[in-house]
Amino acid sequence: MAKDIRVLLYYLYTPIENAEQFAADHLAFCKSIGLKGRILVADEGINGTVSGDYETTQKYMDYVHSLPGMEELWFKIDEESEQAFKKMFVRYKKEIVHLGLEDNDFDNDINPLETTGAYLSPKEFKEALLDKDTVVLDTRNDYEYDLGHFRGAIRPDIRNFRELPQWVRDNKEKFMDKRVVVYCTGGVRCEKFSGWMVREGYKDVGQLHGGIATYGKDPEVQGELWDGKMYVFDERIAVDVNHVNPTIVGKDWFDGTPCERYVNCGNPFCNRRILTSEENEDKYLRGCSHECRVHPRNRYVSKNELTQAEVIERLAAIGESLDQAATV
């Protein structure tokens, strides 16, 4: 299948005047050329992933590079056979990635233009991975790590990025006196988080410049020492990184077998991302727990128009029943 679609991943920390109006104007331009994607705009900068054919994406890159302060913005490009998005969104937010340091007066925000960790090239990052005295910290969410991660990297027990600072404070004895290198998908999270670690007193903090996306495309390292796939926030869900000796590390939520297929739990009030096969999705009604399987608003049940009798039958097949139900 021809790969005539390009997916652009990018970000830039740069002051944007009248960012709300900038976002509105940006959306109008994107729609005018038929671009699809999701872009966040804040006073501190811009962060986005967009997709379109060659002509459309080239128009977009030329447009962005024509904007004051964005002449050198770095686009990371994937070639794909299908669009990565169905619609176009440009939204104004407080931050281009929500670390939330100022939430509940936890801490002051970080400006990566003033404080950030040392940039590591893919080659330098690979060397860090092989150094037993270096701590490698994954700054992404738990479900991203579970699909794929760098070999030996620490998996913080967090559901979202804004929980990471507290997790680090709670576990600082593990790596306070060591060299720490961090990584994320494209680099935007690490710019801010590595700066926060520097401010916390960590003496030697590095970050993978350009993120996992750049590491996988580097002609020298070719994604080596990455296990599994990289989670992405678009229709693709998962993309390849390791082009030397790829492996599968994801495990099916229900039976632990190798799996790289993500779905959201059928209970809309849970919405946990779970790895599972189509067979197990059907078998367990896409519910990550019994409570989610029998929830009255289970989306799998409604989408497939299952009758109560059919639900009872499937529950019985896995040793469960409706009268075990509890409210979530």
Curated annotation (Swiss-Prot):
CDD domains: RHOD_YceA. It is an enzyme of class 1 (oxidoreductase). The active site is at C184. PROSITE patterns: RHODANESE_3. Its EC number is 1.14.-.-. GO terms for biological process: tRNA modification. The keyword tRNA processing applies. One of its GO terms (molecular function) is oxidoreductase activity, acting on paired donors, with incorporation or reduction of molecular oxygen. Pfam families: Rhodanese, Rhodanese_C, UPF0176_N. It catalyses: uridine(34) in tRNA + AH2 + O2 = 5-hydroxyuridine(34) in tRNA + A + H2O. Keywords: Oxidoreductase, tRNA processing. Residues 130-224 form the Rhodanese domain. Belongs to the TrhO family. NCBIfam families: PRK00142.1-3, PRK00142.1-5. Catalyzes oxygen-dependent 5-hydroxyuridine (ho5U) modification at position 34 in tRNAs. This is tRNA uridine(34) hydroxylase. It comes from Streptococcus pneumoniae (strain P1031). The gene is trhO.
